[in-house]
Amino acid sequence: MRDLAYLKLLSREYPNIRAAASDIINLQAICGLPKGTEYFFSDLHGEHEAFIYLLRSSSGIIREKIRETFGHIISEEDEVRLANLIYYPEKMINQIKQANEYTEDWQKTAVYRLVQICREVSSKYTRSKVRKKMPKEFSGVIDELLYVDNTDDNKTEYYSELINTLIDVQVADSFIVAICSLIRSLTIDNLHILGDIFDRGPRPDIILEELMHFHDVDIQWGNHDISWMGAATGNRACICNVLRMALGYNGFDVLEDGYGINLRPLSMFAERVYRDDPCTCFLPQILDKNIYDAVDPKLAAKMHKAIAVLQYKAVSYTHL
């Protein structure tokens, strides 16, 4: 009876033999493709610049694909520029525009090279899977450019017109950003984050923002991450703990710029209570300089001590 129930459920998706056979053929063929690349990162600890570079460069895989695709056709300098364009397309396009190098020739060359790289990195996936990863606004154009044989005399003009029209209607820069995103997406099929995203590093919030835009990621939370979750729910001990950790490592940027936490009441309180105490044991460990909110280390030490004492009190209250 249970088998009959399962068969009835399957019949909704596969109403006849042809439908079932078609899917079996497709799944069996997929088993013959190489497995998608999986990346494991552990203990990020808020080091956003290193993490984002490794993620966007696929730990050097993209540079390797450029070398495999173009060999000695392009110079090493052009390889580096193409790689950086894929990693940080918006930033590189702005730099090229400022240098007055954003010409039609540059756009055509960039689009052509990016399409070749995209073909290379998409070769291990089915067309269906590649389509699912394509940015919606350019999915039709990218699909045509990837799978049209531009060496076919009947399609050469068509291929060229696709690229020319992108430039004529002034969406080449948006297209470049989109196909660069697709390339990065195809070089990493699954992303696994193990351990702490938060800790003593400067900007864990930027790491989270980057992960929110990633297509397939799973996270094993660490103890520092749990503390931030507790703080977000309003637990006073957790709030004090995350503030203490950030202040102890000079992490004012993540608090004030990243999450908009107003530290002025704490600084005024600490200045008043510890005005005659240098709090030298609580001086912050300056691993990274604050970009947006530079705070005098002496004041930071007083704030650090104040929040530490408040944390001990908050923890004691939770056990009463």
PLM regions: where:
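N-terminal low-complexity, Ser/Thr- and acidic-residue-enriched intrinsically disordered segments
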Residues: 17-124, 293-297, 305
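Low-complexity, highly charged intrinsically disordered N-terminal segments
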Residues: 96-180
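Extended charged low-complexity segments that act as oligomerization/scaffolding linkers
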Residues: 70-97, 229-285
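Active-site environment of divalent metal-dependent phosphoester hydrolases
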Residues: 47-48, 199-202, 224-229
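Short secondary-structure boundary/capping segments
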Residues: 54-60, 207-211, 232-243
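A short acidic-Thr-Gly-centered motif at the start of a beta-strand
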Residues: 23-35, 180-190, 203-213
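Divalent metal-coordination and catalytic microenvironments
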Residues: 43, 196, 223
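Conserved small/polar residues in nucleotide/adenosyl-binding loops
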Residues: 318-319
